[in-house]
Amino acid sequence: MSYCKQEGKDCIIFVTKEDHEAPSNAELVEDDPNDPYEDHGLILPNGDINWNCPCLGGMASGPCGQQFKDAFSCFHYSKEEIKGSDCVENFRGMQECMQKYPELYPQEDDNDSAPSGGANTAPTDSLPASSTDSTAAAATENPATS
């Protein structure tokens, strides 16, 4: 016969060998596809946006969370030929909000994406010759005999 013993906040359950030999009568509950706490991707099975998805990186919360939700929802549900083209104002509102909080939403700096020294600083001797230049050079080195 099994029994429980309470020790502080813990409940220790003691079971007998006979308890373990009997088949389990536990009923498994089928997963609820609309359970907001269940792990889902960005889009829930019913087509709604999962605002709890870690893939959003917390953008749905915070001072610009509502603007993000408005813009993202508009894009997700957009029926325009160019998806999201009807959402420009929503994204503009989100961008304006984010610019008010640069410590939370840092702007990408154009200088960070360019290689050091600028784009046009490669020495010319390291540039590959074009195929026509190499063909012309080969023709002058090995003139055809007639």
Swiss-Prot record:
GO terms for cellular component: mitochondrial intermembrane space. A motif (Cx9C motif 1) lies at residues 64-74. It is found in: Mitochondrion intermembrane space. Disulfide bonds join 53-55, 64-97, 74-87. Residues 101-146 are annotated as: Disordered. Residues 123-140 have a biased composition (Low complexity). GO terms for biological process: mitochondrial disulfide relay system; mitochondrial respiratory chain complex assembly; protein import into mitochondrial intermembrane space. Keywords: Disulfide bond, Mitochondrion, Oxidoreductase, Protein transport, Redox-active center, Translocation, Transport. A motif (Cx9C motif 2) lies at residues 87-97. Residues 61-105 form the CHCH domain. One of its GO terms (molecular function) is protein-disulfide reductase activity. Its main location: mitochondrion. The CHCH domain contains a conserved twin Cys-X(9)-Cys motif which is required for import and stability of chchd4/mia40 in mitochondria. Monomer. Can form homooligomers. Central component of a redox-sensitive mitochondrial intermembrane space import machinery which is required for the biogenesis of respiratory chain complexes. Functions as chaperone and catalyzes the formation of disulfide bonds in substrate proteins, such as COX17 or MICU1. Required for the import and folding of small cysteine-containing proteins (small Tim) in the mitochondrial intermembrane space (IMS). Precursor proteins to be imported into the IMS are translocated in their reduced form into the mitochondria. This is Mitochondrial intermembrane space import and assembly protein 40. It comes from Danio rerio (Zebrafish).
